[in-house]
Structure formats: structure tokens, C-alpha cells
Design a protein with these regions (language model features):
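Catalytic core of DAGKc-family lipid kinases
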Residues: 96-172
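ATP/NTP phosphate-donor binding region
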Residues: 1-64, 105-120, 131-137
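ATP/nucleoside-binding phosphotransfer catalytic cores, i.e., glycine-rich phosphate-binding loops
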Residues: 132, 145, 150, 161-164, ...
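Gly/Ser/Thr-rich active-site loops/lids in small-molecule metabolic enzymes
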Residues: 153, 163, 167-171, 175-211
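A short, internal acetyl-CoA/4′-phosphopantetheine-binding micro-motif in the GNAT/acyltransferase core
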Residues: 332-339
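Conserved acetyl-CoA-binding loop-helix of GNAT-fold acetyltransferases
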Residues: 340-353
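C-terminal structural segments of small proteins and small subunits
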Residues: 353-381
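Conserved beta-hairpin
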Residues: 304-315
Length: 381
């Protein structure tokens, strides 16, 4: 990357990024660098001098994108520049993540390193598929076929090189990149895979079949997922966001895209150091007790789920569906690094309190929430 003339900013939707933006715009003004941002994001920052442009223009003009937030913001930034050589600098504003390279206090030093070309660029693989409605989607973490409560298990056939290998019956079947191997795939028992490896990982969450092992495939091998006749209706999640549904008989061709995004690294910490810290591989005692003031539950209505936040980062969620004036609580998922901390109970309590405040009847198909209601019958509608 030569001298940067235009920098694009992508911001966390809720977190205060004002100090980071001021540091970047100050650095840019000294060098005659133009700073661009998305209209809805920069408009909420007081005295922001970044120029508001639409995403397509920002991606075309920027020689560097800076992601200010956590892993979710970083994934969104990577999807914006998918297939381009534009490098992405991840600045962590909140709890430790895997993808961001620097924390906010080190931003000034990082900008100086970019000035002096003291960095490397790491390629990241994406995974792509075409949805049943014809839309092509991409993910840098994973694409998952997830059971819809009330519609039966996810019965999915795995075909490699055109031949059937195994049929899974599970709550979800996940195809992840090495980047995503520490996300949903990890919580399903999948392996941790170095981002330097070009591979796809297939894992089953809560498998009900006799075969429950993960598969690691080379990116040159053809992979397809077939929704079997015995399957229920499945949600198609792309980096954790529901993008569509698959009925029995549907087939998803999964295609890897090596080198789909370029991430800036300064060599301060390795992938394995970040993994050790976030996943608490030395045991839960290392993590310490959670301060109740650090735990926040929010209603992420656009994703149809309640999210529990630790230091502003999503540590778990409770998916729901609102239908005919009722709230149906579907299933919970908690980050493996924070299992055993009572976060699922906090989600259930917050969801039920929210329903009471709205005088909304509640039903639950999530086994955990059903058990919570049995223990706390005063919350049941």
C-alpha cells in the first residue's frame, strides 16, 4: 500500500467512537488525507469532519478502511471491500476481539506505523453461497443452516466432490472459514484453525446423529449442503444474520473465496495469543468474576433477538419471534468463553421483563427458557 490519500471509516452502531474519529481526522488533516464515512454513522458524531458518502463511493475511493468497534463491525467492513485489495485496520473499541489489531489507546502509534509502512497485510478467506431466492451472499465467519423451532431438526447431507459423505441431524450445521473457527463453529466443538490455512470447516451443533465430528476441507474441494426430506424448515444465517430460509430438498453450493479481504497486522500479538486470551484456554479461573455493571441486555429487533453485552460486545443472544401479538422465545446461544456465567438466565429474565412491560403473552420453545419458566412460574403468561 502506497501513500494513503483517502481513508474510509466504518463505525460500531452503538458505541462511542468520537475520540477515535478525532484522532484519525487530526492525523489526516496534517497529511492532506480525505476521511470518508457512511452518512448514518458520521451524522451521530458531534463535530465530525469526515465527509459523508454512500458505501459504494467510499469503497471505490478509499485506500484504507478503518473499522471502529468489535468483531461484528470488522466483519461488516470486510464484506464492504470483499474482493478488493483495500486493506482494513481494525480498532477495538470495547471487549477483546479476534479481528481488531489495535486497541483505542494504541491508535496513534498504529497510524504512525502506517505512515512508515511498518505493517503487514494478512489475507482472509470468505465463504459464499447462492440462497434459494437467487441472492448471492458472502461471510467471513460462517454460513449456517439452523433449526427453526417447531419445524424439526436440521437434517443436512454433506456432499464433497459430488459424493455424499455424511448426513447430520443437529440443531445447526455450520460451514466456517478459519476466521470463523473461533466463533459459532468453536461453540459447536469445531477445531481452532489458523487464518493462514486455506480451508473450510463443517461442524454440527448439538448433533443428534451418531457421527458428530467436524470436517476440515481444502478450499479446492467442492462442498454442497443438501436439506434432506426428513429435515425441518431451516434458517440460513450468514455471519449470524438470518438472510433466508431453506426447505427440504434445497441445496446450497458452498464456494470459498481465498484472499477476499486484506487485514492490516503490526505483529504485536499473534492469532494464538488472541485466542488464548479470548477463549480462556487456561481455565475459567483466569477470566475472573463478572461485574454485574458490565452486563447489559438489549433488544436487537432487526436481528429478532435479545443480546447480552459484556463491555459492549455480544456475548450471547436469545432469538425470538413476534407473531399475532405474542412473543415466542426460540433458542439461546452463549459465547463459549463465557459459559457457566449465568448469561442465559439474564437473557431469559430480561426478555420476560420486557414482555411484561408491554403486556405481551409469552411462549417458549427454547428448552432453557422453558426450564427457567418452570423455576420462575410468576413470569409465565
Amino acid at each position: 500500500m502506497g501513500m494513503v490519500e483517502v481513508v474510509g471509516l466504518v463505525l460500531h452502531p452503538r458505541r462511542d467512537c468520537g475520540s477515535a474519529i478525532r484522532a484519525i481526522t487530526g492525523w489526516a488533516e496534517e497529511r492532506g488525507v480525505t476521511v470518508l464515512g457512511l452518512p448514518a454513522e458520521v451524522s451521530r458524531i458531534n463535530h465530525c469532519t469526515a465527509v459523508a458518502v454512500e458505501a459504494e463511493e467510499m469503497v471505490q475511493r478509499a485506500g484504507l478502511l478503518v473499522s471502529l468497534g468489535g468483531d461484528g463491525t470488522m466483519l461488516r467492513t470486510m464484506r464492504l471491500v470483499e474482493g478488493r485489495k483495500t486493506p482494513v485496520l481494525g480498532v477495538n473499541v470495547g471487549r477483546l476481539g479476534f479481528l481488531a489489531e489495535v486497541d483505542l489507546p494504541a491508535l496513534g502509534e498504529a497510524l504512525s506505523a502506517i505512515d512508515e509502512h511498518r505493517y503487514t497485510v494478512e489475507s482472509r478467506t470468505a465463504v459464499r453461497t447462492v440462497l434459494p431466492d437467487g441472492r448471492e451472499v458472502s461471510a467471513f465467519n460462517d454460513i449456517a443452516l439452523v433449526r427453526v423451532p417447531g419445524h424439526g431438526l436440521a437434517a443436512v447431507g454433506i456432499r464433497v466432490e459430488g459424493r455424499g459423505f455424511v448426513n447430520y441431524a443437529a440443531d445447526a450445521v455450520i460451514v466456517s472459514t478459519p476466521t470463523g473457527s473461533t466463533a459459532y463453529s468453536f461453540s459447536a466443538g469445531g477445531p481452532i484453525v489458523s487464518p493462514n490455512v486455506e480451508a473450510l470447516i463443517v461442524s454440527a451443533a448439538a448433533a443428534h446423529s451418531s457421527f458428530n465430528r467436524s470436517l476440515v476441507l481444502d478450499t479446492s474441494e467442492q462442498l454442497a449442503l443438501e436439506v434432506l426430506p426428513s429435515s425441518g424448515r431451516l434458517a440460513i444465517e450468514v455471519d449470524g444474520i438470518i438472510e433466508g430460509h431453506a426447505e427440504p430438498g434445497a441445496r446450497l453450493e458452498i464456494r470459498p473465496a481465498p484472499g477476499a479481504a486484506q487485514v492490516i497486522r503490526f505483529g504485536r500479538t499473534s492469532f494464538y495469543e488472541r485466542a488464548r486470551r479470548k477463549l480462556r484456554v487456561e481455565g475459567s479461573a483466569q477470566a475472573g468474576a463478572l461485574d454485574a455493571t458490565d452486563v447489559v441486555v438489549v433488544d436487537s429487533f432487526e436481528r429478532e433477538r435479545y443480546e447480552v453485552l459484556l463491555g459492549g460486545e455480544v456475548a450471547g443472544f436469545l432469538r425470538y419471534r413476534r407473531d399475532a401479538g405474542r412473543l415466542e422465545l426460540l433458542h439461546t446461544e452463549i459465547d463459549q468463553a463465557f459459559s457457566g456465567r449465568g448469561l442465559a438466565s439474564r437473557l431469559a429474565a430480561a426478555a420476560l421483563a420486557d414482555a411484561r412491560s408491554r403486556a405481551t403473552p409469552v411462549t417458549a420453545s427454547c428448552p432453557f427458557v422453558m426450564g427457567y419458566l418452570e423455576r420462575h412460574p410468576e413470569n409465565e403468561s
